[in-house]
């Protein structure tokens, strides 16, 4: 995490003050852009397939991916065929849009789409143009609904339902817009969101993250023997939650190593650990499997929404005509 990013979650500093003019400019541009779409001066793209956006108003580490995994399972259980679109941060394919398959790599598609594909084996289209992503899914798959992994601020794309994920621990940091703070939009934006969900905490409208058994980065086999000590490595927005989950399992962390979100690992990053145990997140694991050692493991986590979230979501699905009979 850079010094600027650290300042977002600390008392106002000189760095924050110096960045306020840029934050004001960011607000002006983003507000104008949203207004142009709201007034119809710029045209939205409306797909024939309903779109559910899972996003946030702040950058990094809010925990969208576990909720996307749960949402896919929930919709599938209702008999719907689900596709996913993603920007594919960290990926650099030769051509977009890209339809993810078993040959796709994190270098092409980004870490989160590869994680989602490994877990779900569902149609996933990746690329910077969300309209093209949607059209590719509609042309290649028989789908009933599309989940947009991120995209709340992509006002060119019409959507049926918006779900905003909020980190209960970090909330909105200093409450300022980028780059003076972590916000992509002001907190007033939450008033227009269909479903605001906290990741953790005590809010009735939340989900908790449930860690599963550690798995091998090399072959995805489940670890049966307990690990007592390990090095923790992560390239995610909020590594503290991950490290606390490991410690809660009784694992002593010999060292912790943080890289920027979506960092592309190489084998050289791990030479310092020799043959000692290394633990990482599932998002990190999909980038390290090609050069992993036997004693590298990742921690899968699953979202467990409250009844309040599930009931509100089901009502929205029914009201929007996505699903009948709930």
Curated annotation (Swiss-Prot):
It catalyses: a lipid A disaccharide + ATP = a lipid IVA + ADP + H(+). Pathway: Glycolipid biosynthesis; lipid IV(A) biosynthesis; lipid IV(A) from (3R)-3-hydroxytetradecanoyl-[acyl-carrier-protein] and UDP-N-acetyl-alpha-D-glucosamine: step 6/6. InterPro entries: LpxK, P-loop_NTPase. ATP binds at residues 58-65. The keyword Transferase applies. It comes from the Bacteria. Pfam families: LpxK. GO terms for molecular function: ATP binding; tetraacyldisaccharide 4'-kinase activity. It is an enzyme of class 2 (transferase). Keywords: ATP-binding, Kinase, Lipid A biosynthesis, Lipid biosynthesis, Lipid metabolism, Nucleotide-binding, Transferase. One of its GO terms (cellular component) is plasma membrane. Its EC number is 2.7.1.130. One of its GO terms (biological process) is lipid A biosynthetic process. Transfers the gamma-phosphate of ATP to the 4'-position of a tetraacyldisaccharide 1-phosphate intermediate (termed DS-1-P) to form tetraacyldisaccharide 1,4'-bis-phosphate (lipid IVA). Belongs to the LpxK family. This is Tetraacyldisaccharide 4'-kinase. It comes from Pseudoalteromonas translucida (strain TAC 125). The gene is lpxK.
